[in-house]
Amino acid sequence: MEIIRPMRVAIVAESFLPNVNGVTNSVLRVLEHLKANGHDALVIAPGARDFEEEIGHYLGFEIVRVPTVRVPLIDSLPIGVPLPSVTSVLREYNPDIIHLASPFVLGGAAAFAARQLRIPAIAIYQTDVAGFSQRYHLAPLATASWEWIKTVHNMCQRTLAPSSMSIDELRDHGINDIFHWARGVDSKRFHPGKRSVALRKSWDPSGAKKIVGFVGRLASEKGVECLAGLSGRSDIQLVIVGDGPEAKYLQEMMPDAIFTGALGGEELATTYASLDLFVHPGEFETFCQAIQEAQASGVPTIGPRAGGPIDLINEGVNGLLLDVVDFKETLPAAAEWILDDSRHSEMCAAAWEGVKDKTWEALCTQLLQHYADVIALSQRIPLTFFGPSAEVAKLPLWVARALGVRTRISIEA
């Protein structure tokens, strides 16, 4: 294996602590790997909301915060404002490479800054923004979103995508230089041995029911309402883990379900392992780490035949994929098939066997090799200056106007 020299890595994250989600979790694992292997890092991320505690360092790495705004419909996810100072911070830190975690607003500004400063950049595709636009009845923004995503990612030397479907979708929309980079899972933390008889008894004192669960943000794009088809049954107990804007609506829809709120650490690991079946209906998941964590816990999974779950679920072996259009209607029969005693234990074993070697150590080692490859390539082929006008002209007018002002300011910063 090639020995990688110590690097200075600037990570610009569209989301970060105290917000906990897929983007944040993957950035944390990358930072931990960088620290353990002698590299230096800086994080630029949105600030916390007024009622949340904001941390300024993680593992000794500085976190530079930018102001945030909240967008209607998804106001639980603060959006970082791409100030001109982003360019100044990157210039002063002078990284070997810039890692853009799910770039869109803040990451888009950083992509422009990287070209201006002639610093190589890698974009990590993690969020289906166009899909979210459609789910929130903002379909006209979907096309504009793809134009912007294409611009941002094609300014980077490499795009890393987590699944075969996301790679195909990116290529279909004109994104170049795409490589596959999945996600690791902590198979020591998420493990079948964490199963708790006591926890299961607290959910179902009779001990007669099968426990079916969901873990994730309680928001429209996750499709949690599809689980309502399993509600009110005498043989199934639903357990919904997470919080979000649709929590109250879902509680009213499924009054007999147990809603735990957001969980983390060992409490979350024990919850996963204590399920009999995990269901995630979200059709806009570029990867779906929750499915992988459930599998590491020895739990069969049901997901949509869309996005990341297609790569994670081996139908009939560790779970089932259901068509998006009739997911809710077909879920009860699919759940009954998996929970049947004649096949359930075999599928539990297959779930764990399929992911036990997909460690974050292995995945982050791959990532660092991508860093090294891009740095080496940029040294052989110097980056050209990329002024704002060439790309701004290709954008939707509303984006071009805003970006034109910000880009010109950032050049002077």
From Swiss-Prot:
Does the keyword section mention Ribosomal protein?
A: no
Signal peptide feature range: none
GO MF terms, alphabetically ordered: mannosyltransferase activity
Alphabetized, the UniProt keywords read: Glycosyltransferase, Lipid biosynthesis, Lipid metabolism, Phospholipid biosynthesis, Phospholipid metabolism, Transferase
Enzyme Commission code: 2.4.1.-
Using the UniProt record, name the top-level EC class of this enzyme in a single word: transferase
From the record, what ranges are coiled-coil?
Answer: none
Q: In which pathway does it act?
A: Phospholipid metabolism; phosphatidylinositol metabolism
The record, for InterPro entries, names: Glyco_trans_1, Glyco_trans_4-like_N, Glycosyltransferase_grp1
Give a yes or no for keyword Transferase in this entry.
yes
Which biological process terms from the Gene Ontology are attached to this UniProt entry? glycolipid biosynthetic process; phosphatidylinositol metabolic process; phospholipid biosynthetic process
Q: Which GO terms describe its cellular component?
A: membrane
Family according to the record: Belongs to the glycosyltransferase group 1 family.
Q: What does this protein do?
A: Catalyzes the addition of a mannose residue from GDP-D-mannose to GlcAGroAc2 to generate 1,2-di-O-C16/C18:1-(alpha-D-mannopyranosyl)-(1-4)-(alpha-D-glucopyranosyluronic acid)-(1-3)-glycerol(ManGlcAGroAc2).
Q: Write the protein's name.
A: GDP-mannose-dependent alpha-mannosyltransferase
Organism the protein comes from: Corynebacterium glutamicum (strain ATCC 13032 / DSM 20300 / JCM 1318 / BCRC 11384 / CCUG 27702 / LMG 3730 / NBRC 12168 / NCIMB 10025 / NRRL B-2784 / 534)
User: What gene, per UniProt, encodes this protein?
Assistant: mgtA
